[in-house]
Regions:
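P-loop NTPase motor domains
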Residues: 1-174
Length: 175
């Protein structure tokens, strides 16, 4: 969803064929225990390791020509000079943001003011999904473990639209 938001594409999990294709490719890789970096993801968008999506044939749902166009968009994102910075540095890891190596709690302040709108949506969605993944790995407790504070949330959790950041925000609000 965040990659599609970065590309400025619709990320609806039920209607966006790009989302459905990516979800199926990622699901198969995860189930098989296979690592999938962006170059391999792009290759599998062009030539998915499956013939059907749901009960329909892959070519009916997402023809080869359209998959190639989508793969080119992903490749252009990867090849863009500004995207190189996203591939460097310390990986996003909620446990490292919340705790020191010795296990002491810490405060992490993340500023995204310098990013464009699509990059902000990408980062916020990635951060929220990583936080949800971390949260689901924690055993139950009656004490507070973490606080997420975000200023100017309106664009990420609007009342009517459904941007990529909204589903993970709603998941966190339910916890």
């Amino acid at each position: 969803t965040s990659v599609l938001a970065l590309l400025g594409m619709e990320a609806d999990p039920l209607t966006s064929r790009e989302h459905i294709l990516l979800a199926n490719v990622l699901q198969r890789a995860w189930t098989a225990g296979t690592d999938l970096d962006l170059p391999r993801l792009i290759a599998q968008v062009q030539e998915p390791p499956f013939e059907t999506i749901g009960v329909m044939g892959l070519e009916q749902v997402f023809p080869r020509k359209d998959r190639f166009t989508f793969a080119m968009q992903l490749n252009n994102l990867l090849a863009a000079p500004g995207f190189e910075a996203w591939m460097q540095g310390v990986p996003l890891d909620t446990s490292r943001l919340l705790f020191t190596e010795s296990g002491k709690p810490r405060v992490s302040v993340l500023s995204i003011a310098h990013l464009g709108d699509q990059e902000r949506m990408f980062f916020v969605t990635m951060l929220l999904n990583d936080l949800i993944g971390w949260m689901r790995q924690q055993p139950g407790t009656g004490t507070l473990r973490a606080i997420l504070y975000m200023d100017e949330i309106a664009g990420y959790l609007p009342p009517v639209a459904n941007p990529a950041s909204k589903p993970p925000f709603l998941t966190l609000l339910k916890q």
